[in-house]
Each structure stands twice: as C-alpha cells, then as structure tokens.
C-alpha cells in the first residue's frame, strides 16, 4: 500500500506549473521575435519623440501693485475727485481686478485661435484672491518664458491705456464742472454787487427826497436798508462810485474751486506710468518639459514592444498546435 501511494503521489503534477514553464519556454524560443518587436517599438517611439511638439510651461506669480507704482494715478484721482477720491487700497484692488479680467479675456482669445495657445491665470492659493499664478505653454523653454512676459506686458499696457482714457474723460468732466461752478459763483457775485448798488441808489433817492445830505447816524453798523438814506446823499453818492469800481467779492469756496481747476489743468496724463500688477515671481525658465517625456515614452515602448512580441510568439505557437491536431 505504501509503494502504490508513492507512485500515485509521484504521478500528481501541477497543471499551472507545467503551463507556466511551457509558456516561458515558448517565449524563450521566440525571443528574437520579441526583441525585434521591442526594437521596432523603440524605433517608433524615437520617431514620435523626434516629430512630437514639445511642451514647456513658464510660470509667474503676480499680485496687486505697490503704492509707489500707482502714486501718479492716485494723485490724479485726488486732484479730480478731492475728498471723494477712492482709497489707495481700493485703487490697488481695482487695478489688479482689471488686469485679471483683461488677462482672462486674452487667454480665451488665444485658446480660440486656429492654432490654440495655452495661457492661464488662477489664484496661487485656494480660496484666496491674491496672489495670482499665470502660466504659458510653449514649444521651447525660452519661448515659453518670453511669450509669458510678453503677454503680461501686453495686458498691462492695455490696462494702462484704458486707465489713461478714463482719466482724460474724468479730467474733461471735472474741468467742465469746475468751470461751470466758477461761472455760477461769478454770476451770483455780480448779482449781489448789482443788488447792493441798486439798494444804495434807492437810498440816495430817498435821501434826496428828504433833503438829507449829511449823515444823521453815528453807528454805521446799525444801518439797514430802511435807514440807509440817513447816511446822507453825499455819502451815498460816494458809496455808489466805490461799489461800481470795487471788484467782485467771492467766498473762499470760489478760490478753492479755481485752485482745483488749476491743478486739473496741470495734470499730464500722458506722463503717468501706471502698472496694474507687481511681480512676486518673474516668468520662470522651465528646466523640465511637460511632454513628451523621453524616459516614460521609451519605457512604455519597451513594454508595449515586449507585449506585442510575446503575443505574436504565443499566437503563432497556438496556431501551430491547432493545425497539428
């Protein structure tokens, strides 16, 4: 019984082990086919790497401009609006907001070209508006860096032009408002002067009718329109001549308005150097390209070539076995 059991045990074979060994033997015998497949795959991969467009990404980080960068713009706004001028912090937020909007519009335009270009802008930190990360994907490292800097400058120039136009429009409107205010105050002052002369002339008429030639009162500060004739005709005639030649009397507001108008006239918007952003990090020169990845491509080529070669070998052997049966 013990011998028979040993024979039975010796005749038990593991089918999976036999199949694996047979599989490895088949692959070894067909190694030349596999090697050729790998070589062909590598050659195709090298060809792909030679013709594929490279992608390099240059990145920059920007934020709102410094106070010094918008000093001229802030001064112009203060001259135009006076006490109603926006705060510097509000101007900074407005400028970077306009830059971001203009940059996004440019990115959309580039993406819709016949040959799309990838330009992006997004917050550097999630859930925070600033700073902003801008990037450009080019076919060379130097080209990506140069293009990104060019597009940033292009957007900044565009925002600058828009701001200058807005300033010129606001200056024209502010100048008109100040000129209208001056004319109104001058008309009022002239009317007050004319009214004063008429009042004195009326008092002179009463004085003549009452034959009052000399002053009848001592305290002139107590004189009213009804008692002015008591100053006497001689004094009233002298007052009329004096009032006629005396310049118009204006309030301090009139002279402040003239000063504001002079300040606006002295504004030279064309000389303003306005920047809507500030670099936190200038456009980088990428050292690693995004695609194609040489190492990954070649590794995949070897794996794919090996799999195809193994498939050919196993398929060919399976076909031979089928025909032999």
From Swiss-Prot:
Q: Which Gene3D superfamilies match?
A: FepE-like (3.30.1890.10)
Q: How does it sit in the membrane?
A: Multi-pass membrane protein
Give one Pfam hit by family name. Wzz
In the record, what terms sit under GO molecular function? protein tyrosine kinase activity
Q: Which residues lie on this side of the membrane: Cytoplasmic?
A: 1-31, 316-325
Pathway participation: Bacterial outer membrane biogenesis; lipopolysaccharide biosynthesis
Which regions span the lipid bilayer? 32-52, 295-315
Q: In which compartments does the protein localize?
A: Cell inner membrane
Output the superkingdom of the source species: Bacteria
Tell me which GO cellular component terms the UniProt record holds: plasma membrane
Work out whether the entry's keyword set contains Transcription regulation. no
UniProt main location, coarse: membrane
> Any ranges marked Periplasmic in the topology annotation, and which?
53-294
Q: Does the keyword Membrane apply?
A: yes
Query: Which UniProt keywords are listed?
Result: Cell inner membrane, Cell membrane, Lipopolysaccharide biosynthesis, Membrane, Transmembrane, Transmembrane helix
Which BP terms in the Gene Ontology apply to this protein? Answer: lipopolysaccharide biosynthetic process
The family this protein is said to belong to: Belongs to the WzzB/Cld/Rol family.
Give the function comment from the record. Confers a modal distribution of chain length on the O-antigen component of lipopolysaccharide (LPS). Gives rise to a reduced number of short chain molecules and increases in numbers of longer molecules, with a modal value of 13 (in strain O111/M92) and of 17 (in strain K12).
What is the name attached to this protein's record? Answer: Chain length determinant protein
Query: Upper taxonomic classification of the species?
Result: Bacteria, Pseudomonadati, Pseudomonadota, Gammaproteobacteria, Enterobacterales
């Amino acid at each position: 019984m013990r011998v028979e059991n040993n024979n039975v045990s010796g005749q038990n074979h593991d089918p999976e082990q036999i199949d694996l060994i047979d599989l490895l033997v088949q692959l070894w015998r067909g190694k030349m086919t596999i090697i050729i497949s790998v070589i062909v795959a590598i050659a195709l991969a090298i060809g792909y790497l030679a013709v594929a467009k490279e992608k390099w990404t240059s990145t920059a980080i920007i934020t709102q401009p410094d106070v010094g960068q918008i000093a001229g713009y802030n001064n112009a706004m203060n001259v135009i609006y006076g006490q109603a001028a926006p705060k510097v912090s509000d101007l900074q937020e407005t400028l970077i907001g306009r830059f971001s909007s203009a940059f996004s519009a440019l990115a959309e335009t580039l993406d819709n070209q016949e040959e799309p270009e990838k330009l992006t802008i997004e917050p550097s930190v999630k859930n925070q508006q600033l700073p902003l990360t801008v990037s450009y994907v080019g076919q060379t490292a130097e080209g990506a860096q140069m293009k990104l800097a060019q597009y940033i400058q292009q957007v900044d120039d565009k925002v600058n032009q828009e701001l200058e136009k807005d300033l010129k429009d606001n200056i024209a409107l502010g100048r008109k408002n100040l000129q209208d205010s001056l004319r109104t105050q001058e008309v009022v002052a002239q009317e007050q002067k004319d009214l004063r002369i008429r009042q004195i002339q009326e008092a002179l008429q009463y004085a003549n009718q009452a034959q009052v030639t000399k002053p009848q009162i001592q305290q002139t500060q107590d004189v009213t329109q009804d008692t002015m004739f008591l100053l006497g005709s001689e004094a009233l005639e002298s007052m009329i001549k004096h009032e006629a030649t005396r310049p118009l009397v204006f309030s301090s507001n009139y002279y402040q308005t003239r000063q504001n108008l002079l300040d606006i006239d002295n504004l030279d918007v064309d000389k303003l150097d306005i920047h809507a952003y500030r670099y936190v990090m200038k456009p980088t020169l990428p050292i690693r390209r995004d695609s194609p990845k040489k190492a990954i491509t070649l590794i995949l080529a070897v794996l794919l070539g090996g799999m195809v070669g193994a498939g050919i070998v196993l398929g060919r052997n399976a076909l031979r076995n089928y025909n032999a049966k």
